[in-house]
Amino acid sequence: MNCSQSILRLHPNDNVAVALAPLHAGADLGGYAVGSDVPAGHKVACNALEIGVPVVKFGQLIGRATQRIHPGEHVHAHNLSFETGDIFAPVDDRKALALPEPTRTVFRGYVRPDGRVGTRNFVGILASVNCSASVCHAIAARANAELLPGLQNIDGFVPLVHDHGCGMQSSGEGFEALLRVLKGYRDHPNFGGVLIVGLGCEVNQVTLYKPTNWRDARLSTLNIQETSGSASAVAVALGKLSLISKAANEDMRTECPVSKLTLGMQCGGSDALSGITANPALGVASDILVGNGGTSILSETPEIFGAQHLLIHRSNAMTGRKIEGFLHWWKNYAAKNGATLDNNPSPGNKRGGLTTILEKSLGAVAKAGQSPLTNAYAYAERIDTSGLVYMDSPGYDPVAATGQVAAGANLIAFTTGRGSCFGAKPAPSLKIASNGGLAQSMPEEIDVDAGPIATGAVSIASKGLEIFERLIDLANGEKSKSEMFGYGDLEFVPWKIGATL
């Protein structure tokens, strides 16, 4: 990584560099001048590029020049594009980072009878269908006001509602995905108890979620149609929650190994520095966790498109085939809906300097660190192996994170370059800024600033260790910025696949 005061060249083979600060036309870059004003995070050409020449960043192709580009010229959507045929699988020649030793390898969590461990002790109120959503919110409001003050060991009553559960087939991809999500939340170790509320006539019947495990005494269901109406349903629910929460309030934190942590990794509102600072640092934190027996989940299949070789080359044959299968499904799914995977970067991504899906994907995959990929799972499928794993999901953060939590994540780490107002329940979320400007402008949202990596003030390894230590703090009960604000009730967004009937 070559770094000057104003630009950063990430790999010796790169023919573009990243602006660390706004560059003004005429500024000297050491042998050539800036051709026009270039925003921070955007790319400048290091040498002349003819039409059709590969543009290389991270040592990997990110697209091709669509016009002649002079040294020092801004490289972005006006002169760089990507075609599907540009995807190829070069050897990953990145040097392995030496991982720092963590100072702590234990945390204090809630041990559940099924062997999993919670980092929080919420009581969940899950809607089986959108028709019960308002009642679920009313139940939670009453429970938090009337029951919670007398319950010292419960973090709160959480209403988790969604916009489907009826008007759908009772089989197929969409229904199975919803079942996995709600069953995953029903059994989640961060819930000390759960109440599932339905209307009564929906496709997604509450009887599908009968207790099947240690929650027998801590799970109950309720159909509004079996009461006198909404107000009566709330009253009945409070009686049920009184019993559930009394049992959950007996739960206490005990010392547990970090191998009991499952980390869901997310990125959203990414910029060009995300793949240089925050994502690689999170990758180090993930490697430390995996090295101590824990589990990390990488997701967002549309955002690994073009960089999948970096994952497949370190997985076994079965896992590699699963990832290729996910991508094949997504190509067909996108085409059926008039979309393409190569048009993924959002307007915010582009304003932050990301031009093509290859460039975005190469940065996103950096969250995976350097651990072997041990398995791949369907959306919201229960994670049953340790190590670095992959879970299929959309790139839309709330949907992806909902699937990760359903799969068993008891912590979420979320990197951002443009800014994010995300938070999840019942899993606490740590937000990591890719640049110091964001950390300074949105201090109410950011838990860790990875910006100093870009200037060489700190190493990726040391920042990764800091992220790992902060995750341990969260696992012990310390609140993240998103928890302080109260995020999570409205960020529960199960993936909706298929037609609404």
Model-inferred region functions:
Residues 1-411, 418-501:
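Metallocofactor- and cofactor-centric catalytic cores in central/energy metabolism, strongly enriched
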